[in-house]
Amino acid sequence: MKVLVLGGGVIGVTSAYYLARAGAEVTVLDRQDAPASETSFANAGQVSPGYSTPWAAPGIPLKALKWMLQEHAPLAVRLDGSLFQLRWMAQMLRNCSAQRYAVNKERMMRVAEYSRSCLQQLRADTGIAYEQRTGGTLQLFRTQAQLDAVERDVAVLRECAVPFELLDRDQLAQVEPALAQARDRLTGGLRLPKDETGDCHRFTNELARIATGLGVELRFNQNVDGLVVEGGRIAGVRVNGELLTADRYVMAFGSYSRQALEPLGLDLPVYPVKGYSLTVPLGNPALAPQSTVLDETYKIAVTRFDDRIRVGGMAELGGFDLRLDPRRRATLELVVNDLFPGGDVARASFWTGLRPMTPDGTPIIGATRYANLFLNTGHGTLGWTMACGSGRLIADLITGRSPEISTDGLALDRYTHRPARHLGGSSTPVSA
């Protein structure tokens, strides 16, 4: 079976790896000159299933209004002139009820927890190295109100049997010693000891190398001009004036998936949400984090790699604008200097990327109404967290294996209310 995977980020490469492991003949196409050159290039570095939480949550609409008035707000909305942006935001607002939040969080955690186990198995199978750490993640609260509000998430963690620890301000430094200098500015924290961290860019490049050893062909500098449809199937992909054909196709273009599939009449509710990061050379290890720390006030993650600190976060809804905003750099510098002043911020590299976000936070994984076209996109801020599980799921669906977890509520038909065409069996639409 020949499979074309469109996209060479962490989602596309993990899909290719698992497909090759299942016996498929796989080719990966990407417009860049190397794997993980866009959204997977410099993300926050956390693999955090326990924090797989929908942005669409009770209270978020009011918080969003308040954030718009703040200098260092975690969210910014700039109208891009498209009807799709307005429709996407309306869909997100409809998912802000307690009922929808619970449904969406369960779906996200299902994929994320499975993905962690897949990553651990992949690591055991391949010995892959990507500056990984298994020290858990720590969410920091600066106010009592934030600490009180975490009860909603704690209830879900209990329900899903996810280990956690609630810490007071004196216990924070026992987990992250460098926080001792910030003790008086903090109230407490929520620690998930099973979470991990690692360099997504390095992981993707290493896995791409491993995948080539399994026969995967990686083709870069490939500009996809469009997909060709014949008789309810994809007949090929036009790339640099050439028609490439396969038996199955996987769309893993991230934020650009919608544009690629719109001519086919597929309406993907995937919007580009812009995020930023700083990669800071490590100066004083005693004033650096041991793993990942999440600042609840600014919605920013600070992650330790071997000799670097990665500071990432924020969300801008403004289309496909990739300009670097110096105000966002100032916010990232503010947080890392306040919590972990052990890096050389003056020599930090500043980066931005577009996360492919769905209104309900859940990725879109599965079949479409075109019998040989599959989707693996819409992972938002959790592409690294969900990559291995998503890649394994899509490989199982394509090769006819029974997935190890339920795929309920993951396919595109939760938005279209129209069943996808499976190569074998049927699908029941799930409302979103």
UniProtKB/Swiss-Prot annotation:
Tagged with keyword Transit peptide: no
Highest taxon of source: Bacteria
Residues reported in the UniProt entry to bind FAD: 3-17
Reactions this protein catalyses: a D-alpha-amino acid + A + H2O = a 2-oxocarboxylate + AH2 + NH4(+)
UniProt-listed Enzyme Commission number(s): 1.4.99.-
Signal peptide feature range: none
Cofactor(s) listed in the protein's UniProt record: FAD
Biological process, per Gene Ontology: D-alanine catabolic process
Pathway the protein contributes to: Amino-acid degradation; D-alanine degradation; NH(3) and pyruvate from D-alanine: step 1/1
Entry GO CC: cytoplasm; plasma membrane
Gene Ontology MF terms: D-amino-acid dehydrogenase activity
The protein's enzyme class: oxidoreductase
Keywords, in A-Z order: FAD, Flavoprotein, Oxidoreductase
Biological role stated in the UniProt entry: Oxidative deamination of D-amino acids.
Protein family according to the UniProt entry: Belongs to the DadA oxidoreductase family.
Protein name, per record: D-amino acid dehydrogenase
Gene: dadA
